[in-house]
């Protein structure tokens, strides 16, 4: 009887709140119908506000109420909301023995429960935003004034009232207390049973995924073994087929197609590389052609520069000779010979070569020298000029013998101004500076005249060098006479001519030192002697005869035309009666020197082209 009383008491207590809920639901539905009639747009909004999860929660809540109503074991101070978690745990464990029968409830009870669920579903969307507002941690309203250190002891009465209205399972995901830590909330949500279920789920997932990976690895290994076996079989078949057929491969169609495609790709790559190499070679050849054209242009420009230098040099000689005639008066012939003395046989040979290369007659060339004109650039020479392109590059003997010319000073053209006496030590046997000076038609250093004035008449006109002391003032010096500038200008002209001769002599000396094989020591015969000023006419006739004999070997016309030239530009005086033989030997020596210069020029050109090609590569 006691059990029956407690059962009916629990049912009565559960029906009392249902009655209140039904009355409130009827009132709310009446108001809602009025609102829907007034505002038809609100109907669509309310239709969308019925989510299916809320209905599921309502049904679960109904089932929990039914289980609480039919629960046999209950305490005297029974709270209907304290036993909500017990049926849930029983449901998770799968214990269906304690579930009561569903037929025990009447139809009226079911209708009341459904109406209550509908009322809760209507009121929850409106009250949810008010109730589930997050706590603002910075606001002072949420914090109590007398807050203790242990924030767990703080009680929240408002939240208790709300929990009395709704079971705690509805607010599992919401944060009730803002002062609780996250890990504490998680510990409250996850029970040991839920953790055990999760662990079992993960274990099952591991079991499901593990065999798949193992199966895949096994399949890959089997496939590799299968391919290796197939390769071995193909190799054995190839060997057997080669023995039978005679060298042909036995491959399946797919392998043949793959090999053909690979060969085609390789051939295409090789063709592309060959085409690129051909294009690169064409570009390089084009660059080399451009370089050769540049070298030709440079050689032509250098040729014109050399010709202009020779013409300017000869013009200077002619002007110096003319000025000497005007100043000397009665001694005009000796003055012309004096000015024309630096012109040696090599300059005459250079004039002949220039006339041949430029295809200009000697007479016209002499007239151009007189007037100072240059030949037209349209006339192309048949072969290159015998003069080297760059004398500084050819004179490499200085690099091997740095002490050869110590006291020299380079001029604008690159020739040294003063001859060095240290070169006599580097000369080969049978060759000396005296031989080179004799070859150039000049006198040796021992037999050289003291001054350019052979007679006392010219020496008297030379300004005596007055001593200048540190103690004397410049006002006590003698004033210059009116004729002093003429003498100074004439002396400057002499010095310029002497510098040119010295430069040419040193250049030939370097060439002879570099190529000593052109000299035969058995043919050199030094005969010391000194020409006197009284035998100048006889010396000129002998030189003229020697030049005529040399030029008769080439052509008779040029000798007739150059005879007055040789008279006008005589060479240095001979030393003895063996002048013709010595002159022939000098001419042969000059020809050899010029040949070697041409060879060296060609070698230099080839080296220059090779260097440019290597730089471009």
UniProtKB/Swiss-Prot annotation:
Which InterPro entries does the UniProt record give?
Chromogranin_CS, Granin, ScgII
Q: Where in the cell is it found?
A: Secreted
GO MF annotation, one: chemoattractant activity
User: Which parts of the sequence carry Sulfotyrosine?
Assistant: 151
Cite the post-translational modification comment: O-glycosylated.
**First and last residue of the signal peptide:** 1-27
Task: List modified residues, type Phosphoserine.
Answer: 174, 268, 432, 532, 555-556
Q: Where is this region: Disordered?
A: 120-143, 257-302, 552-583
Q: Which biological process terms from the Gene Ontology are attached to this UniProt entry?
A: angiogenesis; endothelial cell migration; eosinophil chemotaxis; induction of positive chemotaxis; inflammatory response; intracellular signal transduction; MAPK cascade; negative regulation of endothelial cell apoptotic process
Report any Pfam family annotated for this entry: Granin
Spell out the residue ranges making up region: O-glycosylated at one site: 182-200
Which residues form the pro-region?
A: 28-30
* Stored PROSITE patterns: GRANINS_1 (PS00422)
Q: Single GO cellular component annotation? A: endoplasmic reticulum lumen
Q: Which UniProt keywords apply?
A: Calcium, Cleavage on pair of basic residues, Glycoprotein, Phosphoprotein, Secreted, Signal, Sulfation
Comp. bias (Basic and acidic residues) = 257-284, 293-302
Under the subunit heading, UniProt states:
Interacts with Secretogranin III/SCG3.
The remark listed among the other comments is:
Binds calcium with a low-affinity.
What is its biological role? Neuroendocrine protein of the granin family that regulates the biogenesis of secretory granules.
The family assignment reads: Belongs to the chromogranin/secretogranin protein family.
What protein name applies here?
Secretogranin-2
- Organism from which the protein derives: Homo sapiens
């Amino acid at each position: 009887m006691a059990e029956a009383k407690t059962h009916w008491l629990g049912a009565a207590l559960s029906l009392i709140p249902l009655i209140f809920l039904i009355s409130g639901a009827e009132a709310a539905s009446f108001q809602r119908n009025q609102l829907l009639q007034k505002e038809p747009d609100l109907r669509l909004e309310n239709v969308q506000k019925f989510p299916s999860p809320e209905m599921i929660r309502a049904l679960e809540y109904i089932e929990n109420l039914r289980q609480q109503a039919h629960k046999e074991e209950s305490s005297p101070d029974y709270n209907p909301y304290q036993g909500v978690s017990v049926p849930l745990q029983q449901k998770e464990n799968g214990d269906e023995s304690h579930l009561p029968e569903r037929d025990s409830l009447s139809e009226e009870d079911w209708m009341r429960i459904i109406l209550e669920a509908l009322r809760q579903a209507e009121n929850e969307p409106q009250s949810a935003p008010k109730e589930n507002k997050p706590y603002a941690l910075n606001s002072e309203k949420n914090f109590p004034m007398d807050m203790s250190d242990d924030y767990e002891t703080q009680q929240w009465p408002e939240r208790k009232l709300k929990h009395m209205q709704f079971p705690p399972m509805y607010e599992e995901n919401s944060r009730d207390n803002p002062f609780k830590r996250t890990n504490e909330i998680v510990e409250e949500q996850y029970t040991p049973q839920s953790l055990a279920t999760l662990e079992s789920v993960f274990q099952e997932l591991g079991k499901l995924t593990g065999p798949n990976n193992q199966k895949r690895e096994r399949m890959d290994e089997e496939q590799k073994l299968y391919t290796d076996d197939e390769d071995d079989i193909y190799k054995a078949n190839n060997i057997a087929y080669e023995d039978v057929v005679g060298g042909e491969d036995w491959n399946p169609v797919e392998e043949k197609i793959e090999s053909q495609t690979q060969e085609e790709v390789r051939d295409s790559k090789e063709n592309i590389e060959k085409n690129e190499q051909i294009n690169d070679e064409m570009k390089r050849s084009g660059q080399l052609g451009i370089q050769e054209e540049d070298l030709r242009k440079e050689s032509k420009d250098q040729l014109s520069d050399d010709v202009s230098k020779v013409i300017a040099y000869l013009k200077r000689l002619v002007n110096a000779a003319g000025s000497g005639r005007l100043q000397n008066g009665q001694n005009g012939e000796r003055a012309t010979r004096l000015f024309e003395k630096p012109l040696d046989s090599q300059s005459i040979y250079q004039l002949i070569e220039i006339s041949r290369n430029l295809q200009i007659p000697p007479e016209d060339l002499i007239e151009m020298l007189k007037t100072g004109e240059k030949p037209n650039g349209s006339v192309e020479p048949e072969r290159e000029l015998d003069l080297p392109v760059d004398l500084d590059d050819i004179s490499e003997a200085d690099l091997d013998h740095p002490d050869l010319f110590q006291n020299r000073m380079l001029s604008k053209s690159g020739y040294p101004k003063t001859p060095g006496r240290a070169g006599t030590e580097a000369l080969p046997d049978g060759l000396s500076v005296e031989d080179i000076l004799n070859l150039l038609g000049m006198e040796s250093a021992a037999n050289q005249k003291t001054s350019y004035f052979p007679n006392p008449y010219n020496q008297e006109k030379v300004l005596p060098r007055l001593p200048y002391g540190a103690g004397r003032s410049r006002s006590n010096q003698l004033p210059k006479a009116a004729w002093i500038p003429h003498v100074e200008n004439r002396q400057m002209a002499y010095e310029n001519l002497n510098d040119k001769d010295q430069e040419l002599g040193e250049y030939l000396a370097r060439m002879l030192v570099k190529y000593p094989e052109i000299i035969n020591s058995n043919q050199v015969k030094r005969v010391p002697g000194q020409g006197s000023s009284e035998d100048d006419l006889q010396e000129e006739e002998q030189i003229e005869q020697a030049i005529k004999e040399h030029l008769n070997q080439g052509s008779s016309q040029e000798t007739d035309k150059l005879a007055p030239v040789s008279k006008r530009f005589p060479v240095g005086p001979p030393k003895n009666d063996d002048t013709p033989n010595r002159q022939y030997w000098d001419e042969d020596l000059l020809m050899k020197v010029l040949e070697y210069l041409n060879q060296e020029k060609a070698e230099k050109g080839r080296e220059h082209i090779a260097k440019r090609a290597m730089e471009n590569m």
